[in-house]
From Swiss-Prot:
Its cofactor is Mg(2+); Mn(2+). The keyword rRNA-binding does not apply. Its EC number is 2.7.2.1. The record marks 178, 239 as: Transition state stabilizer. Its main location: cytoplasm. This is Acetate kinase. It comes from Maridesulfovibrio salexigens (strain ATCC 14822 / DSM 2638 / NCIMB 8403 / VKM B-1763). The lineage of its organism: Bacteria, Pseudomonadati, Thermodesulfobacteriota, Desulfovibrionia, Desulfovibrionales. The gene is ackA. Mg(2+) binds at residues 7, 382. It catalyses: acetate + ATP = acetyl phosphate + ADP.
């Protein structure tokens, strides 16, 4: 059985076709710059294929994905009818969706209703679903929400100290993000520990250009760093993370910008990029080696904020079995990991330098063998998690 996983953005479509009998990735890629004069598509099986061509809308992009998947030479299926189901990554489900759900007209409208909570993401998801429904008539489709995993938080963790009617009228609360990734690596970490997930306390650290941290207590999300939107929490590539709320008004008053314009700056021009001009850690590390103080400040600030959240969550959980790093930075940047956890030996948190610098991409611990708190690196696999949820929801 084959399941197609789609993550449609405002101008892109990430896709992956999985063989559910093995869990293997048969083909994957991305369509980018949809709606621009010239777009691009990548397609990877054993080899990688790339091409540039215009994609006026998501429909043209999806058609080309189907063409590649069924191509006589490069394809991995003879006909699109071999695709049994489609799973869609959805960033925000608000309080409407507590778990993955089969898509119908009501669900699609619910995703539209959550657009104010994820204006950069949910509109693209809606277009992706509508396009897939058109091109795959009769194929059952499932929405898997980044926010679902965090719905087990208690009100004391997800409510804000603002008038309660804002929650009643608009659903203003903490929702979190990257839930599919946090869920996947928490389960895989419990396997490493040799403990049932339901008995494991784990701090999951998802570090990519977007980043978040979750406290997982007895297998369920107890708290998470991102808030109403994916802008809150730790310092990210281009996003500010948690700041004094009055900063928005402070900037707006001095720049004569609207609140929306200030939020756009905090989303796209802040974080690491705002401090040192770059959100590429490779560039930042190189500049630090050359003595660049702003690059060092950016890295120090980001790691400082990660340490703050880990410390807070350790106290909230009471007992921490493991801390796990995942996603692009978490999996690939040994300096970042070391900076986040160095000097915490008194709390039972250690890093073995050799293990940290020579991780072989298999799920494993990088802490000292006698460390009270295990530190792991696990490559996230959100696509496989979405595909598994899709199969489970549809009973396939």
């Amino acid at each position: 059985m084959k399941v197609l996983v789609i993550n449609a953005g405002s101008s892109s479509i990430k896709y992956q076709l999985l063989d559910m009998s093995t869990g293997n990735d048969l083909a994957s890629g991305i369509v980018e710059r949809i709606g621009e004069e010239m777009g691009s598509i990548s397609y990877k099986t054993g080899e990688k294929y790339t091409a540039e061509q215009p994609f006026p809308t998501h429909r043209e992009g999806m058609v080309e994905v189907i063409n590649l998947l069924t191509d006589a030479d490069k394809g991995v299926v003879k006909d699109k009818a071999e695709i049994a189901a489609i799973g869609h990554r959805i960033v925000h489900g608000g309080e409407l969706f507590f778990e993955p759900v089969e898509i119908d007209d009501k669900v699609l409208q619910g995703i539209r209703d959550c657009i104010p909570l994820a204006p950069l993401h949910n509109p693209g998801h809606v277009i992706g679903i509508e396009t897939a429904m058109e091109l795959f008539p009769g194929v059952r489709q499932v929405a898997v929400f980044d926010t679902s995993f965090h719905q087990t938080m208690e009100p004391k963790a997800y409510m804000y100290g603002v008038p309660y009617k804002y929650y009643e009228d608009w659903g203003l609360r903490r929702y979190g993000a990257h839930g599919t990734s946090h869920k996947y690596v928490a389960r895989e970490t419990a396997k490493l520990l040799g403990k049932p997930l339901e008995e494991s306390n784990i701090i999951t650290v998802h570090l990519g250009n977007g980043a978040s941290i979750s406290a997982v207590k007895n297998g369920k999300c107890y708290d998470t760093s991102m808030g109403l939107t994916p802008l809150g929490g730790i310092i990210m590539g281009t996003r500010c993370g948690d700041i004094d709320p009055a900063i928005v008004g402070f900037i707006a008053e001095r720049t004569k910008q609207s609140a929306a314009e200030v939020v756009a700056t905090l989303t796209n021009e802040s974080g690491l990029k705002g401090i040192c001009g770059s959100n590429d850690l490779r560039d930042i590390h190189a500049r630090i080696e050359e003595g660049d103080e702003k690059a060092k400040l950016a890295l120090d600030m980001a790691c400082h904020k990660v340490r703050q959240f880990i410390g807070a969550y350790a106290f909230e959980l009471g007992r921490v079995d493991a801390i796990v790093f995942t996603a692009g930075i978490g999996e690939n940047d040994e300096i970042y990991r070391e900076n986040c956890l160095s000097g915490l030996e008194n709390f039972g948190i250690t890093i073995n330098k050799e293990k940290n610098e020579n991780w072989d991409r298999t799920p494993s611990f990088i802490s000292e063998d006698d460390g009270a708190v295990k530190v792991a690196i696990i490559a996230t696999n959100e696509e496989l998690e979405i595909a598994n949820d899709t199969v489970k929801v549809l009973g396939l």
